[in-house]
Amino acid sequence: MIQGVNEQRPTKCDAALARCGLSYPKVSIDRAEPLMTRSHAVALNLFKTKSPDLLMAEAAAPERQLKRTLGALDLTAIGIGAIIGAGIFALTGTAAAGQVFSSRLETPVINFIQAWLSGGSVVFGRAGAGPAIAVSFIVAGIACGFAALCYAELASMIPVSGSAYTYSYATLGEIVAWIIGWDLILEYAVGNMAVAVGWSGYFVQLCDSLFHLRFPLWLVNDHQTATSLLAKGGDALEGYSSTTLPVIAGHSIAINLPALLIVGAVTAILVYGIRESARANTMIVIIKVAVVVFVIAFGAFMVNPTNWHPFAPNGFAGVMSGAAIVFFAFIGFDAVSTTAEETRNPQRDMPIGIIASLIICTLLYVLMSSILTGIKIYTVYTGDAAAVATAFASKPWARALVSAGALAGTTSVILVFQLGQPRIFMAMARDGLLPQYFARIHPRFRTPHITTIWTGVVVGGVAMVTNIGDLADLTNIGTLFAFILVCLGVNVLRRVAPERPRPFRVPFVPVFPILGVILCIALMLSLPVMTWIRFFVWLGIGLTIYFLYSVRHSKLRRGVDAGITEDVPPPFIKT
């Protein structure tokens, strides 16, 4: 049976709750209960939720407060900074011309499902959209829009750093929150490692194109990449000032120094302050949007309308296949929600930043893809990861322009993702799921400096010595999984707390969130088999850490053991 128990000493969190007119209900589990009953209670506690009021009250504690300086324009720039990376230059050609896979592990799961349903053989490829790639971008933007609307509602209701992790804690329970918090490492930290390596490549290209400045092979590549290039020889080694690897203690050495330096520089800015970080991001966003607009405006005069015929050579299947590819050019808008505690008016500005950034990027993508397929017939882009350079091949400045745009694009992605990851770690540490050390706020700068520095060290260090390009798809599947839980969270919170004020409301609930879930699952199935295998391995590692560490240190769980529990039951338990 449940009965009142021990009085607890007041804590700083208790004081913050009292200021908001809230308190922890005092309950405990009778130690004389049968073991099965107590085990059942422990199992239920895995899905125990935190009320939005409690989450906001905990964040309002003076020692935890971040500096609120961001407005709607800053948030929109953060969203654009995260969304538009090198993908706009790399994915457009692939989606228009189609894709061929070399093995079963590289083939999307959906291809195997289609073969099983039709009784035919597995197709090792995806049809291209052709000039209808513009429609593919619209379809992908709409699919992303369902998730964006859900993020906007939850971000305005629960303006707390932590993004999908926090929303899952409020709607689906602690273990689901841990899973999504662990999963988001794939989007932010692992994704940033890959982006930093890509940034290094564009930096080297730009230095060569503009200043004829070349670097030694060993200084701008990790060891695996350097030895691979040496094995290829010939043109693969063109562009380096030296191809000899230094030897220390009998081992050849190669490091990607530019990748480390860009992560280090961004980390320093983020530690110094959110206002300075937002300003730096806005300037970078202006540069990369200007490059995209220039390419669109200049390319419009080179368009040959006959290249747009046939418009959809592979019909509806080609359009949807293209949408599955280009969807991943939209990933990143959710990073806006990690800055909720640093926004002056989060209830109003968070939805504006999330939705406005997605609309602007969709418009730019549609125009860019239309121009590229109008300049050259879409089949030219088969297997081409540099579609813009190919389209402007007759222009000597094309390579430098693409490198400059991609460099600006990846710089802002690194900045925004490095901004987002520490705030998720901070939110998890507040709840006891990570060491409290990670929840510390710098007394002067009011930034989560400990987690920011640690994230920078890990991301920069790994990017310096390893090329994790093969793991880039993990970012995609991790992000889609987060989108699914956020969409589910909207429906859950509408059911368990229908009376709560919602500054922004998703229209047509539960239809829109359900459509978001369905489309995200479909897009997850468009990812390779190997990505799914790696994803489940990653989740397995995360659950192991949860049960070995986080369960024993969870503040919610320790509250139950000490006579303190939450006032919100698991969402599947009717009260």
Task: Please give the residue ranges for each predicted region.
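Extracellular loop-to-transmembrane helix junctions
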Residues: A90-A231, S242, S357-I360, F535-W538, ...
